[in-house]
């Protein structure tokens, strides 16, 4: 409260569109770097005041989160082999492969990141469909699906490796099941059985691009440039559809028409921020927040956790510095830098620890969404204030 003796600076940014791919936060990152250089600021941390909620039914704890969850969108473009509906064993159904990938990855805690006992929610499908545009008795040739994949510690290259392994397992399960059912069908029908010809193949988008580049040379890059220009003519095209169209067209150029699953990342990307205390800024933020929470008098049970569990603007206060992680993201996200961009280098330079101290409510994104007034308007603001003052001591 002693403003006259206040030392330090607070940079306030009104970034009101986290739901719109965090356009506000992404635009403020380079401005923060300019301000740091102009004013010779030594930034200490980023504080967000995003909504928090109970983590399970009956949970009455209030949470302060030092760090934030990340998000990737691993996407699977699945090429099967068409068949007539009356002779289905002559083909392989991409919808069946998609279903098997969903069964393997969807809500499977094997894919959950765990750090310091905090468990990330497992992946969940956000879309799954075949790409057949009309009715016919021919089975679909292609389908695709993508997952919301949260991270606490896994980088894009690590997630790519995990989901490729999962898709390979799923693809092989489909082939094994098809052969088993085809054998039964042949036995029931009195037909001779021969093992079906399918082989499980899964590869990242980067490998598909390189294989087509070997065949077509600069023609593939011209195709991408022309396609980018054409797709950008539609300002309303969805970023995920933009990426899909590029994968579709590059695959069409490939001479190999056998079944395959192409794995790539769709936008958006939210890096996780894991505040471990490995450097002075992280250590200071952790110590400050723990001290403030411990010494704040209230009727609430307030607990410090490591990862804000919902995607937030905090993700863009830093970015992975591992070359493999960044390269995997850029080379496996079709349309990166064209339709969808991130100031990754600026995020790496900013590189700040983060904390979320927000209001408490229930039923987020429902018509019954509401706030608990006392904590939200009395306790949370005090926590924010005390955190700022103590960081600047």
Where are these regions (language model features)?
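Acidic/histidine-rich catalytic neighborhood of metal-dependent amide-processing enzymes
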Residues: 1-67
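An extended, acidic, His-containing surface patch that forms the Zn2+-binding/catalytic region
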Residues: 183-393
